[in-house]
């Protein structure tokens, strides 16, 4: 038996708010691919998916504690007489920690000040929550994923520039950024 523990309300990570025009996975639009994969997972008999669940502790010999939020996200009326949370005590043969983090922060003095954010976080704020993270944005990058954020900011009418430490990039995302008038500064 397998447990898939996810702290969000649904599976998918950043694929949930990706721009389907720019991303395909196995020749499918990313949202179609994601829905297909989630349906495949839900149909597996030996798999239990725990959404809204946080792994709280990882002890010796693969003993884990997880807290599942069952009704905390519901209104008081909806959750009356319902269990709020469940504590899972898990003894696993094997554990795979797949945190999903691919972006690394820049290390510099005062990088924890307001307005200094990871590009993927900015993209989630603007595309998923509809929240602007400033009117003038500079994105510093060493790969093409930051161009997704730049394009999202640009589509919302925000001023954005990209500083790319590489000499150039011929990716579709970088080309699209140039075509949309986003200033790119190369190394």
Q: What name fits each language-model region?
A:
Residues 1-187:
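Residues forming the flavin
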């Amino acid at each position: 038996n397998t447990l898939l523990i996810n702290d969000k309300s649904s599976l998918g990570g950043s694929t949930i708010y990706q721009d389907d025009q720019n991303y395909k996975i196995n020749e499918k639009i990313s949202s179609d691919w994601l829905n297909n994969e989630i349906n495949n997972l839900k149909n597996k008999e030996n798999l239990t998916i725990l959404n809204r669940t946080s792994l709280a502790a990882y002890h010796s010999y693969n003993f884990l504690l997880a807290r599942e939020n069952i009704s905390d996200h519901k209104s008081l009326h909806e959750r009356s007489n319902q269990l709020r949370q469940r504590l899972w005590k898990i003894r696993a043969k094997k554990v795979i920690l797949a945190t999903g983090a691919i972006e690394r922060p820049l290390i510099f003095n005062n990088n924890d000040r307001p307005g200094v954010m990871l590009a993927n976080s900015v993209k989630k704020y603007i595309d998923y929550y509809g929240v602007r993270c400033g009117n003038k944005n500079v994105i510093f990058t060493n790969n093409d994923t930051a161009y997704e954020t730049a394009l999202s900011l640009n589509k919302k009418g925000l001023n954005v520039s990209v500083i790319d430490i590489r000499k150039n990039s011929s990716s579709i995302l970088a080309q699209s950024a140039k075509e949309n008038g986003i200033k790119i500064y190369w190394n």
